[in-house]
Amino acid sequence: MNERQRLWLGSGLVLLQFGLLIVLALLAWPVMENWAITPVAWAAAAGAVLLIGWTLRVNRPGNFNIHPRPRVGGTLVTSGPYGWIRHPMYTALLLGAWALAWTAGNDEVWLAWWALSLVLWAKSTLEERWMLAQHPGYAHYREQTKRFVPWVY
């Protein structure tokens, strides 16, 4: 796959990511509208918000990109949540989306959650190819740090 194809693939994955997040929210809305949200879902959503805040505090806007291609001149961040997992924003999205799926509890929402998981896995895989090319220390960092879940994966 050449660079242009990777750029198009990255853009497609971003569109899929946001499309699936919208689908998840719409499918979960009838339950959320009635405030029938369990404490487990509240905890997962709060965890997602806290992880996003922590990530943005450590990796300031301007250093990262919504597209999986890293910004030119961006620095490799390995502290804060990045010391635990390589893709904390993706983990936060999955955790927040999990809260929606748990709340709605139907097959369609869980299918959308699994689809989002696959999209974010593909996006992170593509991003890591670019990170390896752009940051000499990324290979070692990748060996030492899990992708989405500390100590697990």
Feature names for model-found ranges:
Residues 87:
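Short, conserved phosphate/pyrophosphate- and ester-handling motifs at nucleotide-, phospho-/glycolipid
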